[in-house]
Regions:
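Catalytic cores of processing enzymes, dominated by hydrolases/peptidases
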Residues: 133-136
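Extended, subdomain-level signal for the structured scaffold at the beginning of enzyme domains
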Residues: 1-105, 117-122, 127, 138-163, ...
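A short beta-strand/loop micro-motif in the catalytic core of glycosyltransferases
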Residues: 109-110, 131
Length: 208
């Protein structure tokens, strides 16, 4: 069975985070593990508070993630949006190193809304890639990189696509926001399973 890790930090966007979790689990071919990433506002190592004040109990805390997945890489890692949540994810240096490690190993690295610009860009994995994010956030990558890398270097030879609901370029998958979460989630299902599984899931859940 394929493995997917979903990283959650306080301030994550609930629809963007849990739509992929739900659809991937419905495929019955992907084991999805949610991971709570520490942040200054966290009171419990497992409980993460969404941007709309919905608490979610993660499957693993961050120490458990490090004990189980630093060497045994999953097939996919995913970062939801929400500006505060994305900023909390981006502040974690161990997570940035893990993104680079998974990317270099050919694992799928995926993000939606604020996360492509805030979390992924400064790791350098968007270089030479087609990608998308929440509208207008691509203009602020210099700010999000916070001096760790210049925006011109982070996005060297990349193409920002502002119209498509999601972009898949090699092992990098990005999407725009809450309204594109379902299409994005189904692309992740297709990539980790197959087109027929995605089709059956689309029919079974009465998608438009």
């Amino acid at each position: 069975m394929k493995q997917a890790l979903v990283f959650l930090a306080d301030g994550f966007e609930e629809i963007e985070a849990l739509t992929p979790v739900d659809y991937l689990r419905r495929s019955h071919q992907v084991e999805v593990t949610t991971v709570a990433v520490p942040s200054p506002t966290m009171n419990d190592p497992y409980i993460v508070l969404g941007s709309h004040k919905i608490p979610v109990i993660a499957d693993m805390n961050f120490d458990e993630f490090k004990a189980n997945f630093l060497e045994e890489l999953p097939d996919l890692i995913f970062f939801p949006g929400g500006m505060t949540g994305s900023a909390n994810l981006a502040a974690n240096k161990e997570l940035a190193a893990y993104i680079k490690k998974c990317f270099a190993a050919g694992k799928i690295v995926s993000a939606i809304c604020a996360a492509p610009a805030v979390v992924l860009a400064k790791t350098g994995i968007l270089k030479g890639r087609r990608w998308t994010c929440y509208p207008e956030m691509e203009k602020n990558v210099e700010q999000y990189c916070a001096g760790e890398i210049s925006a011109s270097e982070a996005l060297e030879n990349s193409v920002h696509c502002s119209e498509n609901p999601f972009e898949t370029d090699g092992n990098v998958v990005t999407s725009r926001g809450v309204g594109t979460a379902e299409q994005f989630a189904m692309e992740l299902v297709r990539l980790l399973t197959d087109s027929e599984t995605a089709r059956k899931l689309r029919v079974g859940t009465v998608q438009r």
